[in-house]
Regions:
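FAD/FMN-dependent oxidoreductases across multiple families
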Residues: 94-100, 107, 353-447
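Juxtamembrane "helix-exit" motif on the non-cytosolic side of transmembrane helices
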Residues: 13-21
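Conserved FAD-binding catalytic core of PHBH/FMO-like flavoproteins
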Residues: 267-274, 278-398
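Glycine-rich FAD pyrophosphate-binding loop
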Residues: 126-130, 140-162
């Protein structure tokens, strides 16, 4: 069609030019000059339109006439129409398609193991739970350059009757992690050892903590559990690449047998959201929701601790915890602040219906004289609280993409006071192991970690720390 229009236009112009040429010689000169300059303008316009830029596609010889005509001024006004409109819409669609493809390609590149680019809100590690282990691990891994997101059900200060006595092994681990500042300003109490009261023989045995290489006592420390947790959380929150979310994790997300992230319900908005990462650390504590889906071992509850706080109670020996060998179960006593002392009474079997009566009638008569009066006052005025004394041996977690740690993974009797020591040493171990893996998407590198027989290692360390 364009060729036909070009020929018709050329014939029309030729005839008109013939009429003009028949007028006079002068007119012939003027018209000749006009045609020369007009042709030159067409050529320059054509070269400008199709000759710009290196590597641009040149028009074919078959389309030369149509392209030459289209270069004429106002040609687009005569020959544009629905086709141009459709072409514009198609161009917009192609442009959007290109942007969409480019975005998809960038996402694919960022998510590839070798070229992953993380940001503050694109975590490498998600930690479920912000207790001792979760908070401490978030702080130290963030200092190693990891982007960490912590999801905690309730970020208010917790109120518990256990997790208050940090043994020397745990205190050393806390210092090694650079977190010793978390026990400062808590009105904490230094502990240098134990005094064992044998009520049957009416004797006392002192058991001091071991000495260090400088012949100084390796002390422990006791405090309000909630204050310590808030100190650890503040240390983690101070790191710029740690993000805290207040919400409840409902599911571990899996793909091809590997944990790839979590689904959680945000507390403030009640919205259900998903978050993905290469490594999820489950540290949701004693009553773990996800333990049974990751390990086969079950929790064994041997007894219950009943706790209360005595005010201004004297100590048999300064800075020493006390253990009373009562009948039928022991009583643990340790100072947690400048004027408060925790009492934990171990009760085996079925819990008595009237706890206050049990404490007054069964426990009070067996206590040392210096404790009796403050104990009786505490039982009568303070709220008695209970906590199961649980045992859970460690076992391997045979699922990639997830770690199960803390009380969710391994527990021993609270009488040992070794729970937090084990937790902090586990943080030390995993900090050391993970620092050798710069990219946690490198599954092969991560899978090499179990080659150290991790279950046996944790069991050995747990027993060693408890014995310190």
């Amino acid at each position: 069609m364009w060729t036909f229009l070009g020929i018709a236009t050329f014939t029309y112009v030729y005839k008109k030019c013939d009429d003009l040429l028949s007028v006079s010689y002068a007119n012939k000169e003027v018209l000749g000059a006009f045609l020369v300059f007009f042709s030159l303008g067409l050529i320059l316009s054509y070269r400008y339109r199709y000759g710009q830029g290196k590597g641009k596609k040149q028009p074919s010889n078959m389309g030369f006439i149509s392209q030459l005509i289209s270069a004429l001024p106002l040609a687009s006004s005569f020959f544009s129409g629905p086709t141009d409109s459709n072409g514009t819409e198609q161009g917009k669609a192609n442009q959007y398609k290109k942007r969409k493809v480019s975005f998809s390609e960038s996402v694919q590149t960022e998510n590839s193991p070798s070229n992953r680019i993380t940001s503050q809100f694109d975590p490498e590690i998600i930690i479920v739970g912000s207790g001792v282990l979760g908070s401490a691990m978030a702080a130290v891994l963030a200092r190693d350059g990891r982007n960490v997101t912590v999801i905690e059900r309730d970020l208010k200060e917790p109120d518990r009757i256990v997790g208050e006595l940090l043994q020397p092994g745990g205190y050393r681990a806390l210092k090694a992690l650079g977190l010793e500042g978390t026990v400062e300003g808590l009105d904490a109490h230094i502990v240098n050892g134990y005094v064992i009261h044998d009520m049957e023989s009416k004797t006392e045995v002192e058991i001091p903590y071991p000495l260090d290489e400088n012949s100084q006592v390796q002390c422990g420390t006791a405090f309000h559990h909630g204050r310590f947790i808030m100190g650890l959380r503040n240390a983690a929150m101070a790191e710029p690449n740690v993000r805290f979310i207040e919400g409840t994790v409902t599911h571990l997300l899996e793909e091809d047998g590997k944990v790839t992230g979590v689904q959680y319900k945000e507390k403030e908005s009640a919205e259900t959201k998903e978050l993905y990462c290469p490594l999820t650390v489950v540290a949701d504590g004693h009553f773990s929701k996800f333990r049974k889906s990751l390990v086969k071992n079950k929790v064994n509850v041997s007894s219950h601790f009943v706790g209360c706080i005595m005010k201004d109670s004297p100590q048999f020996k300064p800075n020493h915890a006390e253990l009373v060998l009562a009948n039928p179960s022991p009583v643990l006593i340790y100072q947690i602040s400048s004027n408060e002392t925790r009492v934990l009474v171990d009760i085996r079997g079925e819990m008595p219906r009237h706890l206050k009566n049990y404490m007054i009638e069964k426990i009070y008569p067996q206590l040392p004289e210096h404790i009796k009066e403050p104990f009786l006052l505490a039982v009568q005025t303070d709220r008695l609280r209970t906590m199961p004394a649980s045992f859970l041996p460690p076992s391997p977690v045979n699922k990639p993409g997830v770690l199960l740690l803390g009380d969710a993974y391994n527990m021993r009797h609270p009488l040992t006071g070794g729970g937090m020591s084990v937790v902090l040493n586990d943080v030390r171990i995993w900090k050391s192991l993970l620092c050798n893996i710069p990219d946690l998407h490198d599954n092969q590198a991560v899978l090499k970690i179990p080659c150290i027989n991790f279950g046996k290692l944790v069991f050995t360390i747990s027993n060693w720390v408890d014995s310190v």
